[in-house]
Amino acid sequence: SGSGKSITCKSILNLVNKKFNVSGEIIFQGRDLLKLSQEEIRKVRGKDISMVLQNPMTSFNPLYTIENQMIETFLEHMDISREKALEISKEALEKMSLKNIEKILKKYPHELSGGMLQRIMIGIAIILKPKLIIADEPTTAIDSINQKDIIEEFILLKKNLNVSILFVSHDLGILSHIADNLIVMKEGKIVESGTTEEIIYNFKHEHTKFLIETKRALMGKFKKVKK
């Protein structure tokens, strides 16, 4: 918490408050995203780079149904009719193994669980086939059962769509299952980076040590309670 993970993710898509001064370079497919106009970066969002947020409720407009929001998203990024957009919306939910699709589409965001909203966001990303998915602590706001399912969805995404995923989490246990490489941040700076195996088994920075030992201590207490 407070290490700068989320603000870094938002900076990539120019979603930070205008009061923030963002400098440097963010190179994506040969282009510096910081130099793009608002119109150009808007076209990158969703189609080329999708973002799955920590609290899925903030990704949806509470005044519109899921159907309306999915259709508008696909119309924005794809040259298709409204009827085709509805068909694709149903396809996206089917890919997430969601049941009662017709009912889900007619629901408002507050009528669905956090885990279900996360699946809808991932389903939208699958249809748009972005080059990069930024997942900003997508398992934090949902229960442990849904966490496992969401992690599996991301693993399948990486495998089946050959998409790059920037997965943000404070839980090294989760990251050990999904990440090929790790970056450890503290107070807005990168303090350590390397392959997942290198970071977990041969860490060098004290902050990395703290994160790993904290996770191991929690797991030890959990096992004692379980017994």
Give the ranges of each region predicted by the language model.
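A short, surface-exposed alpha-helical micro-motif characterized by mixed small hydrophobic
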Residues: 175-177
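C-terminal boundary and immediately downstream tail of ABC-type ATPase nucleotide-binding domains
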Residues: 201-227
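Conserved ABC ATPase signature
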Residues: 107-112, 116
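ABC ATPase "signature
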Residues: 193-194, 202
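Conserved ABC transporter NBD signature motif
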Residues: 21-32
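A short, proline-enriched helix->beta-strand linker immediately N-terminal to the Walker B motif
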Residues: 127-131
